[in-house]
Amino acid sequence: MQDALDAQSENPKKIFMDVYTDWCGPCKLLDKKTFRNPDVVKYVNEHFYAVKFDAEGNDEFTYQGNKFSNPDYVAGKRGRKPSHIFARSLRISGYPSMVFFDEKSNLIFPVTGFHTPQQLEIFLKLIQSDDYKQVTSQKMFKAYEKNFVGTFKG
């Protein structure tokens, strides 16, 4: 995360953060089926700083003036581990979660659960185009979704 935050200061781009855990089956499926899709890879690399964030890992970084770490991290522990303070601060409780941040590192919103490339496409393009600023209700999102024409291949 720190690398993406540092890069934003020189070249502002939004951040796309994949929040996962070691034991999460849908997280592994997302890696295998969605994040290896050529359309997803190309689009994310062109428009976002991509971050993989272990929600139970021991990364340390500074976000918006606050230092984040996982003081309860135990190296080598298998299965569920204590959550990273950053994951808790974002109120991430389900995995996988994909979290979007704007060019100034402000949280936009998270998307939870496994998504196919075609299901993820609408969120990537909604965020990248800044349309999310106008789509402010579930009803508006349904209308946006109905009119959305995707281009990602399976």
Model-derived segments and their meaning:
Residues F35:
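Serine-hydrolase catalytic core recognition
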Residues Q2-D3, P38-V41, N45-F109, P117, ...:
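Thioredoxin-like thiol-disulfide oxidoreductase module
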Residues M1-I15, V44:
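A short beta-strand-turn-helix
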Residues G25-P26, S69:
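A short, structure-level motif marking secondary-structure boundaries and short turns
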Residues K28-K32:
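Detector for the c-type heme attachment site
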